[in-house]
Structure formats: C-alpha cells, structure tokens
UniProtKB/Swiss-Prot annotation:
Cell wall formation. Catalyzes the transfer of a GlcNAc subunit on undecaprenyl-pyrophosphoryl-MurNAc-pentapeptide (lipid intermediate I) to form undecaprenyl-pyrophosphoryl-MurNAc-(pentapeptide)GlcNAc (lipid intermediate II). Belongs to the glycosyltransferase 28 family. MurG subfamily. Pathway: Cell wall biogenesis; peptidoglycan biosynthesis. It comes from Brucella ovis (strain ATCC 25840 / 63/290 / NCTC 10512). This is UDP-N-acetylglucosamine--N-acetylmuramyl-(pentapeptide) pyrophosphoryl-undecaprenol N-acetylglucosamine transferase. UDP-N-acetyl-alpha-D-glucosamine binds at residues 17-19, 128, 169, 197, 298. InterPro entries: GlcNAc_MurG, Glyco_trans_28_C, GlycoTrans_28_N. GO terms for biological process: carbohydrate metabolic process; cell division; cell wall organization; lipid glycosylation; peptidoglycan biosynthetic process; regulation of cell shape. It catalyses: di-trans,octa-cis-undecaprenyl diphospho-N-acetyl-alpha-D-muramoyl-L-alanyl-D-glutamyl-meso-2,6-diaminopimeloyl-D-alanyl-D-alanine + UDP-N-acetyl-alpha-D-glucosamine = di-trans,octa-cis-undecaprenyl diphospho-[N-acetyl-alpha-D-glucosaminyl-(1->4)]-N-acetyl-alpha-D-muramoyl-L-alanyl-D-glutamyl-meso-2,6-diaminopimeloyl-D-alanyl-D-alanine + UDP + H(+). The keyword Cell inner membrane applies. Keywords: Cell cycle, Cell division, Cell inner membrane, Cell membrane, Cell shape, Cell wall biogenesis/degradation, Glycosyltransferase, Membrane, Peptidoglycan synthesis, Transferase. Its EC number is 2.4.1.227. The keyword Cell cycle applies.
Length: 379
C-alpha cells in the first residue's frame, strides 16, 4: 500500500450485505492498485465482509431502512438517516474525498446525499437488472450511474448511465482460470448450493428432501457444499448425515469462489453478485429467484443468464422436492449439457468490470462528464 493517497481519497458506500459489499471490494482493489486511498462507509452488519479493508478505513454510518407506514417508525427512520447525514458530513470534511461511490442499500443514502450537497462528485453502481429503491432515490442527484445488468440505452437516466458489468473480487478472477471439467456418469458429482451472503431457508429444507428421493446409487455420487443460515445449519447437516451424503454445511464460506470453481453444478438464488460470479467463473446453474424481492430484481438477473443458455430458472413455487430431484438427477446424468451451459455462462461474464468501473470513477473524480467518458475523453 505504499502508493496510497498519491491520487487522493475515494469513499465507497455500501449496504452491509455481500451483494453490496463484494463489488465494492472489487473496485477498492482496482483503485488501490492505481494509487487511490479507498475508504468504506457502511452499516454495522458489514463486519464479516470487510476483511479487504483496513479497520481504520471502515466507517460505520448511522442509517435505517424505510419500511412500512407507521408514523412513529418512519420518524425514527428519518431521524437515523439525518444522523447518518451528519456522520457523513463530518467524515467527508476530514477525508476530503474526490469521489463518493454508492453500491446500493439504504446505508448509502446518507453518504451520497451528504456528498452531493457538499459538491463532491458522486457515482452509483446498480448491480441488478432492475434499479433498487435506494439507488432510485439517488439517481437524479448523482453525476453518473454504472450498471451491472441494467438495460443499455433505456430509461430516464440513460444519458448518464454506463454499463460496466458487476466487479468481481480477485479470488473470483483466480477461480475463473479453472476450466470446467464435467463429471463422468460414475464420478463423484460436486453440488454447490447457496442463497447469497445471507443464506436461504428454502434450500435448507428443499435440497435434503430432494436428495432423499434420488436412487441410492446416485446419492452415493454426491458431494455437497451448502451455505445455510445459522438457524438452519444443524438440521441441514443432520439430514445429509442420515442420508449418508457427505456435506459441508456452514453459514458462510470465505473461499466461495474456489468452491464454485470446484463444483459441477450450482443451485443458487440470483442476486447480481451471485450471477456475476457464476458467469465469470463459468459454471452451469439452476437459479431460483427470491420470490419476495420487492423489485423482482432477482428474476430479471436470472432471465439475463438464462437467455444466454447458461442457467435454468425455476420459480420457488414450482420447485417441489420431486421436481428438484428430477432436475438434479438430469444434471448428474447429462454432463455434455452441463458443459455447454458452463461455456454459455462464461461467454457472458465480464471479468474486466472492475477495470471499467474504475475508469469511470476516475473520470468522474477528475470532473469529466459521462458523455465525455463515453466519447473516450478520460483522465
């Protein structure tokens, strides 16, 4: 880190979940390599995800989620957001950032509002195919919008939107160098199941139930890695033990990219970071969009990969244990199809997204407009 602060300070603001923080981490890595001193503004949930940032470069900003219509609750929420605005102003007066970049989630509202009101250049990155509520609230105020899966050249903010893709962390790029090798019909079949950084209760119940329906000789082939919420971890592990299926079950895996590279098949939710990592690494997948997402963003993300032939998309409501068992059995016995899916997924991956987003960030920090950036006028 000897070259830190040569260029100045950039603050990244992200909600405290992996979906928001992983792309922020990827951009931070790229910007540090270019000589920027990168700080993170986030909320208290972020603790297990921020290992890529020095402790004195992580700043917890007070915030709250806008939900419901209870007047008292709304008053408390707006008070917390106002306090976060004051926190952000104090932080920015000290750090004097040349740019503030938001990655979505309500904790980004105070820093981005404060920055725009203080005349600091601002940029937001929207990972999903449908813009989230926090980013929608900021889109009219910021200098530029970067998109992961946003439709290109459409919408009210098309003129200041650049499609960069979703930045992926360095371990994902390392994992991407591992070619996909299909399992032979008598080989061990490595299945990876995860529901994003916060897990998925549905998978903890549905996958063991489906595995129980497989013929014994096919169960014997399975090696399962499954991310489960802490409250579901023990029951999922016990279910696999009863079936005699080796399974590594945990609430969080720090080496998830390596595990994905090792997998023959992935069953997952379809958050933007998940879909981006699947495409960069290039693995066949069954995507089950979270059905209660307010903006149906996961369904749109999944559709983008399915259209390329890189994944099957199944609604959770349609996924009985019997159907899941049939789809899993099909995957285990059709290695050629999975190999084609892996190639299709990798063909739409954007491993250079962090570089493109860093280029845009540097342009906005230097005072360039999005139009100038699109025309090739860059720092």
């Amino acid at each position: 880190m000897d070259n830190l602060a040569n260029q100045g300070v950039i603050v990244l603001a992200a909600g405290g979940t992996g979906g928001h923080l992983f792309p922020a981490e990827a951009l931070a890595h790229e910007l540090r390599a270019r000589g920027w001193d990168v700080h993170l503004a986030t909320d208290a949930r972020a603790q297990r995800f921020v290992g890529a940032f020095a402790q004195d470069h992580v700043h917890v900003i007070r915030s709250a989620t806008i939900a419901g219509r209870n007047p008292v609750a709304l008053l408390k929420t707006f008070w917390s957001l106002w306090q976060g605005n004051l926190d952000s102003r104090k932080l920015f007066r000290r750090l004097k950032p040349k740019l503030v970049v938001g990655f979505g989630g309500y904790p980004t509202l105070p820093p981005l509002y404060a920055a725009s009101n203080m005349g600091i250049p601002t940029l937001i990155h929207e990972q999903n195919a449908v813009m989230g509520r926090a980013n929608k609230g900021l889109a009219g105020r910021v200098k530029a919008i970067a998109g992961g899966f946003l439709p290109e050249n459409s919408g009210a903010y098309a003129a200041k939107t650049v499609i960069t893709g979703n930045p992926v962390r360095p371990p994902v790029l390392v994992a991407a160098a591992t070619p996909y090798t299909p399992a032979g019909k008598d080989d061990r079949f490595r299945l990876l199941v995860f529901g994003g950084s916060q897990g998925a209760q549905f998978f903890s119940q549905a996958i063991p139930a489906a595995v129980a329906l497989l013929p014994e000789h096919e169960r014997a082939r399975l090696l399962i890695t499954q991310q489960a919420r802490k409250e579901d971890e023990a029951s999922a592990r016990q279910a696999y033990e009863k079936l005699g299926v080796p399974a590594d079950v945990a609430p969080f895996f720090n080496d998830m990219p390596a595990r994905m590279a090792d997998a023959h098949f992935v069953i997952a939710r379809s958050g933007a970071s998940t879909v981006s990592e699947i495409t960069v690494i290039g693995r066949p997948a069954m995507l089950v969009p979270f059905p209660h997402a307010l903006d149906h963003d996961q369904a749109a993300n999944a559709a983008a990969l399915a259209a390329a032939g890189g994944a099957e998309v199944v609604r959770q409501a349609d996924l009985s244990p019997q159907r899941l068992a049939e789809m899993l059995q099909s995957a285990m016995n059709e290695p050629e199809r999975l190999e084609q899916q892996a190639k299709a997924a990798k063909s739409v991956g954007k491993p250079d997204a962090a570089r493109l987003l860093a280029d845009l960030a540097e342009a906005i920090a230097s005072g360039k407009t999005v139009q100038e950036f699109k025309e090739g006028n860059r720092p």
